[in-house]
Amino acid sequence: LDGGDFSMGTLIQTVYETEAAELRMLGYLGCDVTTWGNHEFDYRSSGLANMLNTAKASGENVPSLVVCNVDWSAMEKAGLTEGQQQIKDAFENYGVKDYVVVQKGDVKIAVFGVFGKDSLDCAPTCELLFEDPIEASKKTVEEIKKNEDVDMIACVSHSGTVEDEDKSEDEILAKNVPDIDLIISGHTHTQLDE
């Protein structure tokens, strides 16, 4: 599982759109599921859309991409911008979902993704609108519990943790959605002692 920001930080990012090298490498490494982070928007909506389409067209094993709090309803009501439409089409082509179920041995795990508020603040080129991460997570967990027979519910989150518990988005998520068994927390690079 991966918590996002898979696309930046090395020279390989120069082929982000044309080769989808980072996403394809996650597949080579055996990563089953990822979500996106703020850096996936560094090449704007068209860059993210091109990367997803390139990864899909490669025919290679790539991880599932999950994010449950994109607010397509609000964007469609206002009329999708060109960038929003590009990402929506790429999502459909790639098969992006709110959650997926993976089987590891005898264990079935539902994995959903969420994009945090601070992540959005760090992605000024992101054209998408998002539902509140906590509320979207609650809805998704309820949907999983209703429709899936799983042993565990995991969240790949690009929200993060910080020392101030009142601002630590993934700690707040854990407290407000107690049916999540595991949160893979990306974004903040914070070391936690417990």
PLM feature spans:
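Acidic, metal/ion-coordinating pockets
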Residues: L1-E194
